[in-house]
Swiss-Prot record:
This is Glutamate racemase. One of its GO terms (biological process) is peptidoglycan biosynthetic process. The gene is murI. It holds the Pfam family Asp_Glu_race. Provides the (R)-glutamate required for cell wall biosynthesis. It catalyses: L-glutamate = D-glutamate. The active site is at residues 73, 183.
Amino acid sequence: MNNAPIGIFDSGVGGLTVARVIMEQLPNESVIYIGDTANSPYGPKPIAQVRELSLAIGEELVRRGCKMIVIACNTATSAALRDLRERFDVPVLGVILPAVRRAVSTTRNGKIGVIGTEGTIKSGAYQELFAASPSVEVHAQACPSFVSFVERGITSGRQILGVAQGYVEPLQAAGVDTLVLGCTHYPLLTGVIQLAMGDRVTLVSSAEETAKDVFKTLSMTDMLASEDSTPVRTFESTGDPVLFAQLAERFLGPHVTNVEKFAGM
C-alpha cells in the first residue's frame, strides 16, 4: 500500500476530465493537480518548449512525493511522455494510447477520426499508434481554437458550433464512424462536437481508459492507497487561481473547493 498522491497535470482545466474519473474510480487516492494556465495553450508551442514545461512540472510533482504522474494532456503526452519516463523513477502515464485502444475496439467500419491541437496532430503520435492496426483508416484534423474557447468558458452557442462544423467537415466526408477527442479539453465540447458530427458517430475520450490504466499500474506495483486512507485533493494553477476555480466547476463541480497558486516554475 502507498498513500502518496497521484500527480496529474495539463496545460489548463482540460485534464480535470481525466482527474474526475480517476477520483471517482479510485476514491481513496490523494491527488495533486496542476493546471499550467499561464502557458496555455500548449498546442501551438514548439515541442521543445512543451517538453521543458512538462519536465518542470514533473520535477515538482516528484519533489512533493507523488507515486505516479499522469500527463492529462495530449500535446504534452506526445511531446514529453518518453522524457518523463526516462527522467523519473515513478510510473508515468499518458492519455493517447488509452484513447487509441478504445477507438479501435469501438469502430464498426474501420474509419477513425482524430481531432486535437496543432501540436498533437503534427506530432503524428496518434497515427503512429493506430498503425499497429492495419485495418484502421485514420483521418486527423487539428482544431486549434477549441482550447481557447474552453479556457474562456465558452462551450456552446452558434459561434463555436460554426467553428466545429468547419473543423469536422473533412471527417464527415471521409465517412468516419468513430471520433477520438484528442485533447482533454474537448469532452466539455461533447454536445457541440456531437451535433456537428451527427448521432451516428461515436465520440471517444481517453478519461475512463486512462483511469483503468492508473488502477492497473498501481495494483501491479502494490501502490494502491489503503482502504482506510482519507484522500487529500489539491488543485493548483500557474495562472489566475480564481478563474481556474470558476472553470473547474464545469468539470468537477463541488470537488474543487480551493485552488492554490502554483509557484514551482
